[in-house]
Amino acid sequence: MKNENSSFVVFDNTHSGILFNDDNHAQYPIRYYNVINGVGIIPESGHSYYGYIYKGSIELYTTTRYSQYLSEGMYFSLSEVFELRNFTNELSKVIVIEVVNGAGNYAQDKFSAMYQIGGQIEDKGRLKYIDGCTDSLLIAPVKKGNPCLNHLHFPAKIDQTQHTHPTHRIGIVANGQGECITPFGNLPLQKGTIFIIKEWDNISYSIALDGKRYANGQHAFKTTDSVMNVIAFHPDSDFGATDEIHPMINRTIVNGVSASTLSEIRTK
């Protein structure tokens, strides 16, 4: 069950399994899952996964590493087969994004997510965003262009500027409440709301409630008396390290010159 318009999709979080299958996307093939008490996903070897625990606690089990015990507000990424196991009697819920490594831009870039665990998320973001909002980069792109996982913080009484994104934004409300404002209708948001903000391809428009044409994916977030914290997965980025520019090579100095500018000694 879902509530959808031309900008935004809200999913029912009471059922486990695949929520959104976009594995035919030419550039960024992904799948989106809701995992309840460890049920709802069968990971595939060779794919990458990003997850966020939004209720209860789980054991992240793999055959190659020690088990990790994660609780609400924690997150992870990895590129191997895994299991999410309940280790208490309480209900556990996890959203998982699967990146199809062998297709689209991911195949060209030979992408593979690193094994990382973090959290809990903080009360606010570390970076300034727009209209009083802040954000933090929870899992950074391994290299420029790769996916990333973000925390977006909305203080109370935020009325965001309408905007679009060039790729899907896959998210969940970690805590608090607010509203997604779109020309095609508004959608309430509360803790545990799973959603997708649709990408805008620069050419697709739809007729809105006022009878005018607006870009698909146009939206803004609004809060009143409550703060709201959102976890958002981006399938791509225009930020991150490259083979020519990264902290290790930038700050390696040869006769007063950064090794980043010395092509003759850079690893080929």
Predicted regions and their residues:
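Ankyrin-repeat and related helical/solenoid repeat scaffolds used for protein-protein interactions
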Residues: 191-200
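A mid-sequence, solvent-exposed acidic-amphipathic segment
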Residues: 149-167, 173-176, 180-182
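Short, surface-exposed secondary-structure boundary micro-motifs
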Residues: 81, 200-201
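Intrinsic disorder/low-complexity detector
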Residues: 1-149, 155-156, 185-191, 207-268
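A generic structural signal for residues embedded in beta-strands
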Residues: 77-78, 181, 197, 205
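Histidine-centered active-site/metal-ligand motif
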Residues: 163-165, 203, 219
